[in-house]
From Swiss-Prot:
SMART domains given in the database record: BMC
Keyword Lipoprotein: no
Uses: Artificial BMCs can be made in E.coli by expressing pduA-pduB/B'-pduT-pduU-pduN-pduJ-pduK (in this order). Enzymes can be targeted to the BMC, and appear to be encapsulated within it. Upon overexpression of PduB or PduB' and mixing of the resulting purified sheets with 2-ethyl-1-hexanol, will form closed shells. Enzymes (tested with endogenous BMC enzyme DDH and the peroxidase activity of cytC) can be encapsulated in the shells; the enzyme is active in the shells. The shells are permeable to a variety of compounds, showing they could be used to make protein based synthetic bioreactors.
Top-level taxon in the UniProt lineage: Bacteria
Gene label: pduB
Lineage of producing organism: Bacteria, Pseudomonadati, Pseudomonadota, Gammaproteobacteria, Enterobacterales
Annotated Gene Ontology cellular component terms: propanediol degradation polyhedral organelle
Keywords: Bacterial microcompartment
Protein name: Bacterial microcompartment shell protein PduB
Disruption phenotype: Releases increased amounts of acetaldehyde when grown on propanediol. Cells do not make BMCs, diol dehydratase is found in diffuse aggregates near the cell pole; it was later found this a double pduA-pduBB' deletion. A deletion that prevents synthesis of both proteins makes no BMCs, about 20% of cells form amorphous polar bodies. Grows in an interrupted manner on 1,2-PD and vitamin B12; grows for a while then stops, then restarts as if a toxic compound was accumulating and then decreases.
Factors inducing expression: BMC production is induced by growth on 1,2-PD vitamin B12 medium.
GO molecular function annotations of the record: structural molecule activity
């Protein structure tokens, strides 16, 4: 079978899956309830807020030293900052921070994506929230930590790599800062690692729905040299969701050819 025939076969399977409506819930059958809580880890430090999936640590500094603020070169200077840092995950944390700034009087002042994933193909993350009141900043970090149980729902991995999908009906300031996403419009993030998987996912997404490209990153251009391809899209909510789900199906199919079936550790939310 030629490579073109293989791609066409996979695309046909993806379109068939997306076009098939999900089974209706059986009346009377209890549905699982997803808990969204920070991990139960304790620490006596006042700066400690909590931990979460992805080796994520939430911290807050009530009164940042001015010399550190100068060295950090933040766009805006705030007396109090919140720190959301992780070994694994970039998209889930950016999406969680986006929800945090929607819910609190805080602002994302810095987003960095270190080469990490604990030796895998992707990123870690370092996100700084700023605010004039330490209680607002702490609340922002709490919201972000709790959101991670949801935003990790469409991260699928196996021994060869991972795929990641994110979706929101209304982008806010974290997505704008990270990718230039239009505020108030639906936004989707599509990630594939190895990068070859991500390129195919990106192409599938754009062919499956009428969406706009916001940003594209590849190993030498915008990914901290991780082995990923990343597409960020915007548009009408239904179209963005369609593009993201189409990319998810073809990404899972292709990644499975390199190893076991890709699995997610949290329930899918898209």
């Amino acid at each position: 079978m030629s490579s073109n025939e293989l791609v066409e076969q996979i695309m046909a399977q993806v379109i068939a899956r997306v076009a098939t409506p999900e089974q209706q819930a059986i009346p009377g059958q209890p549905q699982p309830i997803r808990e969204t809580a920070m991990a139960e880890k304790s620490c006596s430090l006042t700066e400690f807020v909590g931990t979460a999936i992805g080796d994520t640590l939430g911290l807050v500094i009530a009164n940042v030293d001015t010399a550190l603020l100068d060295a950090m070169k933040l766009e805006k200077r705030y007396r109090s900052i919140g720190i959301l840092g992780a070994r694994t995950g970039a998209g889930p944390h950016i999406m969680a921070a986006d929800e945090a700034v929607k819910a609190t009087n805080t602002e994302v002042v810095s987003i960095e994506l270190p080469r990490d994933t604990k030796g895998g193909a992707g990123h870690g993350s370092l996100i700084i929230l700023g605010g004039n009141d330490v209680s607002d900043v702490k609340r922002g970090i709490e919201v972000a930590l709790k959101e991670l149980d949801r935003t990790f729902g469409d991260v699928y991995g196996n021994e060869a790599g991972h795929i990641e999908l994110q979706y929101t009906a209304r982008a806010s300031y974290a997505l704008e800062k990270a990718f230039g996403a239009p505020i108030g419009r639906a936004c989707g993030i599509i990630v594939g690692a190895p990068a070859s998987v991500g390129v195919l996912m990106a192409d599938t997404a754009l062919k499956s729905a009428n969406v706009e490209v916001v940003a594209y990153s590849s190993p030498a251009h915008g990914t901290s040299f991780s082995n990923e391809a990343i597409l960020v899209i915007s548009g009408d909510s239904g179209a963005v969701r369609q593009a993201v789900t189409s990319a998810r199906e073809i990404g899972k199919t292709v990644l499975a050819t390199l190893g076991s079936e890709p699995k997610n550790d949290r329930p899918s939310y898209i």
